[in-house]
Amino acid sequence: PDVAQPWSYAELVLREKYPDLPEVEDEYAVSMQQKVLRSMIEEVAFAVSTNESRPVHTGALFEIADMSLSMVAVDGFRLAFRREKLEKLEGGAFSFVCPGSALSEVKSICGDTEDLVTVTLGKRHILFEIGDTQLICRRLEGEFLDYKNAIPRKNPIQIVAETKALIAVSYTHLTLPTN
């Protein structure tokens, strides 16, 4: 249909002209607060690879098990990992890789609120339900890096520090004297 006014004219496309949205079978679903998911994405997305030679690493791995969500991203040089407890889990343990572009969209849609976001995993797609908004993206297929073996478990060097002090140091410039 066309919309015409004396000062403007617009040609609109009907909904029927667009392809139907894919059906996402709700095999698995998880719910968490929007602010928690947003924070997880902010802390992990920087390590999502932009190199297309390994397409599966252009996204972040979501691992859901034992009432917790682990999010992992790697780019060949960096590995980012974050784990959070879940509020609601349906269907048991599961994992998937979400494209980095979809992560940035989810982050922009999520507010700094305790309202829930539901993530539903289908055979080929992922559905994010954030309030009245639905975002559907295609899962990335392939073998994601075994990050558990990439992080050494036994190391003779251990550092114990207060979180606030460590964060304060990370934002300052240290100059160490040399002998």
What do these predicted ranges mean?
Residues 1-174:
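Structural preference for solvent-exposed beta-strand-turn elements
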Residues 175-179:
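A short, hydrophobic C-terminal helix/tail in secreted or cell-surface proteins
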